[in-house]
Structures are given as C-alpha cells and as structure tokens.
Amino acid sequence: MKSKVIKKVAAVSLSALMICSLSACGGSGKKEVEKTEVDVNYADIKVGEDYTDIEADLKFLTHKTDMVDTKFQEYIEEFQKLYPNVNIEYEGITDYANDITTRLTTGDWGDICMVPVTVDKDELSNYFTSFGNQGDLAKVYENDMLNSYAYDKEVYGIPSMANVQGIVYNKAVFAKAGITELPKTPDEFIEALKQIKEKTDAIPLYTNFSAGWTMTAWDAYIDGGATGDANFVNTGLTKGANPFSDRKDGTGPYAVYSTLYNAVKEGLTEEDPTTTDWEGSKGMLNRGEIGCMALGSWAVTQVQAAGDNADDIGYMTFPITVDGKQYAAAGPDYCYGINCNSSEDEQVAAMCYIKWLAEKSGFAQSEGGLSIVIGDEYPEALAALDGVELVVNQPAEPGEENLFQDINNDSELGINVSGAIPTQIVEETTSGTMTLEDMVNEWNEKWTAAQEANGVTAE
C-alpha cells in the first residue's frame, strides 16, 4: 500500500458477528462430507490465462445482500469473458453472522463464502481450502492483512478488502458549525459536536443504536488506533490488568468509550436512540441532517451514493492523539473462503474468481476500502488520512491463537462481536442508573474473571 506507514496490531476487526466459536456452537456435529484435496497454488494462477477452459457451477454465500442483483451480476459478466464456462450464483444472507455458522456445519453449503470469525484457527482446514503458504501470498498481498485466517503458515481466507476505522462526517455541516480543523482528541471532538448543535440543525452524532451491529464500530477504535501499540490486543487486552480503566492521558479503551458516553450524556446524539434507522441515516448524513457517524471506511461510498451531495462526505480518524501522533486501526474485512468439500474443478474455478475479485475487479476501491494488493493506491475518500499511521493486525503467539476470542466470549463483553459495551453505554446513559465508572468497574471485573478462567494472570 502506498503513502502510509503501516504497523502491526492484534487480530480482531470485523463488525457484528456471533460471540460463540463454531466448535462451541456445534461444530462437532459437522456432516461428514468427503474432503477434496487440490494440488493448485493460488499464488501462481495467472487470471485470464490459466484454467480458462475449466467448467464449474459455483454458489457464493454473501452478506452483501444489496449487491446480489446489481454489482455482483456485473462482476459475473466480466469474469465470464475470461472464464465462459464458470457459472456463479450469489446467495445473499440477511443474518449472515448467525446463519453462516450453522450452514458451515452441513459441509455442503456452497463453494465460496465470507469466512466467519466463529471458526477457530485450528479448525480452518476442516472447512476451507488452503490458498497456500503465507510467505508466497505475501509477495502479492499485504502480509499483515493475511493473518486473520492463517494457521501453521497456511492461509484459508483472502480479504475482500481492508477497512480503516474512523468517523464518516459531513464537511458542509462541519464548515457551517465553524469547525476549521478536524478534532484530534476526545475533548476537541465533544467541543465540535457542541458547535454543530449550537450552530446548525443537524444531529451532531448519530449512533445508529437500533441496528445493533453498528455499535461494534466503537469497539474497533480501542486497540491500535487508541493506543499506537502494535500489540495491544495480545498484551493490553488479552493479558492486561483492568484494560478498561482510565489511563488519564486521553488514550486507550476508556478514552473511546467515554467519548460515546459524554456525547450521549450531553445531548449530542439523536433524541431517542431506539428510533434510529440505519438505511435512512445514510441519506440524512448525505443531506446534512447528521454531522457524523462512527463507521468503518466501507461506509463512505454508501453515504456518498445516498443523495446528491457526495462531495460533502469525508472521513477522519477517531479523535485520539498518542504522544502527539494520530493512529488509525486498519484490518481486513470479510475474507473469501473456499469449501474444501467442493469438487476439484469447483475449487480451482473458485480460486480464479477470488483472485479476479481481489486483483482485477476494483471492488475494494469502489466500496471505500483499501485494496490488499501491494502498491495499489488508496481511494480518494480516504485522502484525509494522509499522515495518519495505520495499525494493522498482528497475530497472537503460537498456541494462543484463540485466547483473545475465548476471553472475549467468556466475559460476554463481545468486543468487535456484539457491541455489548457501547450498547450498554447508550442504554444506561439514556434510561439507566449506572455511571460510567460503574460500567468500567463491571467490564474490568468480567474481563478479569474471564482471564482467570482461561489461565491468564493479568500483567
């Protein structure tokens, strides 16, 4: 990737996904389907030159329900110019995070899917085909983006794109409010929201509380973007003592969650969070009826397309500064996986299509994300991140690949999974009795108990 300094950070970055792992949710009941071994190196495939005569009918399970009958059909048409005998049928799943886990246990769910985080790393080979050695793939793709579904040096998921975690905002609203510089600290952000409330008719910060999954965006800010620590999830969260406590320097998880708390407490969000409307919010932000929303970079193009004011939509990093420098967490979005039980021709055809999607389709850029291909340019929508240091996934130590997920599950805090913490913040601040400190103490107690249950002595 160009124009950015890239660090490594811990491996968690998807939005609203299930808390329990596949094995914990019944993976042991997987239907016995014969696994098909394929002796093809994905990295060596030359798209449009190799396997152009292959015949296959592929079923592709996707969470992108809005694209099944539109953009994905265009992709199929373009791909078939190179591979005319490969037919692809997309199936959009509305409740993807939950349904895909159940579907995987049958073994015959289709040929390509977006790999859920519910699959433990040591179980990946039971469900998915290896794309090959990570070192070979890292010659073409950003190595750090391959870590999420890599195990024992084999890669089982190719990222569809990478996301940066930040804030989508309306530049015209910010200008009308007299905000001439983007906020770089939580205090500056709250002050900017107050200016929007005082000088415009826009809702300063729209939580999208009712959608549920949107609340996980706040979880995505707490690691590298809020700390500048390249190993924060593995050390500061998984093995750290009381990770939600106030650091007293405007950084870390507390700084993120307290920003949401203060925004809601001071009336800088919508009047009734239970009435928020995700689909409608995109048009509202486009029209300047909303000042900003906490969402990944993937949301930029959706908001731009939701009205006539695409040029008014901008993206900024979350307002935290660490020792004078700003960071932004970045990591892979959903990753493409291939059913290891599909036939050899189906697996090879699936590899060709996935490689075309990753390298030729322009999908990542069109969705406001980052391409994982080394050297690809950043989309124009993310130009404001110039000079911000991106922090990317670092895997856990060998033997600890599932440790964070186990602690996260046992604590029931659902970081990057259920949005339990930011959801509680909104609920308690609007209609509850707990103070922020009450909630912080509760989170620390739950996390400590989960650490101890998994043999971790906090450092």
Show which residues each predicted segment covers.
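Periplasmic solute-binding protein
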Residues: 123-127, 145-182, 208-239, 330-340, ...
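Short, low-complexity disordered leader/linker segments with a strong preference
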Residues: 1-58, 81, 445-459
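C-terminal capping/gating helix-and-loop segments adjacent to ligand/active sites or protein-protein/ligand interfaces
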Residues: 150, 367, 376-377, 390-452
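Extracytoplasmic/periplasmic substrate-recognition and gating elements
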Residues: 77, 81-82, 87, 177, ...
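Hinge/lid segment of periplasmic solute-binding proteins
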Residues: 34-50, 116-166, 172, 190, ...
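Short, solvent-exposed loop/beta-turn-alpha elements that line the ligand-binding surface or hinge
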Residues: 50, 132-143, 225-255, 305-308, ...
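Extracytoplasmic "Venus flytrap"/periplasmic binding protein-like
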Residues: 78-144, 156, 172-184, 284, ...
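Glycine-centered hinge/linker elements that transmit conformational signals in sensory
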Residues: 193, 238-273
